[in-house]
Amino acid sequence: MAKLKRSNDRKVTNYVHVTKGGNATVGIANSIGLPSGQGFSCPDATAFCAKVCYAGKLEKVRKAVSSVLLHNWELLRDADLTDTVTLLSEMVAEFVKDCDRRKAPKLFRIHWDGDFFSPTYVAAWGRVIRDNPDVQFWAYTRVQTAAVYLHSQRLDNLALYFSADPDNIDVARFLEDKGINIAYVDTTFAKGKAEFPTAVRCPENNKAIDLINDKGSACARCGLCVNGRRNVLFSTTKK
C-alpha cells in the first residue's frame, strides 16, 4: 500500500536542525496536509476563509507542495475506515521513530492545510489519536460535526480548536458553550478581542516571537495551541 506523506512546517515543527551557517530549519516533518477548498477536503470552508487561506495560496505557487497534498488526498478520499486507520497509523509510527531517534518531543499538527472531510476520516483520526497516547496532537477544524465528535471522545492527547471567523461565529459560540476551544481570525486583533474577550493573540501572528529559531518553532516554544490552554486569536493583517 502506498504511504501518506508528511509535511515540513517551520512554524509547527517539533525539532529544529541548525545548519553550519546558523540557520534554523525543520528537522522533523510533524504535520499532514490535504488540498484545501470545498471541492477537496474543506467542506465547511467559509467565504472569509477562502479569501484569506494562506495554505490555498501556497498550493497554487508551489507545485511540489500541491503534489504532496494531492497524493494524500487520492489515498484517503475514498478509503474505508480500516484502510484510513492503517494509512494514518503507519504515518504516525514513522513520525514516532523520527522523534525517538532524535529524542524530540512528540508533537503532531493535524492538517497544516485541509480539514476533516468525512465522518470516516474523522473516526479514523479518533482511533489513531487514542492508539498513540505518547503523542500530543493538535488540530483546527471548521467542520462542526468533526469538532463535536472529537470533543466527545475525550482524548487527553488532542488539543482541538474550532476555526472561526465572521462567517461562522454563531457556530463558534455554540461550540464554545460545549467546552470546545475557539481559534478566531478576523482582520484585526481588536475585532477578534471584541468577539472573544478572553482569547489571547497568537504570539507569532502578533510578531512577538520568531517563526523559527535555534530554540525551536514558534508553536513548540509557545505551547498555547499545542496544549489547548485557551481560545486564541489570529489577525489577517497581523495588527
Curated annotation (Swiss-Prot):
Matches recorded under Pfam families: GP88
Protein name according to UniProt: Gene 88 protein
Organism placement in taxonomy: Viruses, Duplodnaviria, Heunggongvirae, Uroviricota, Caudoviricetes
Gene it is expressed from: 88
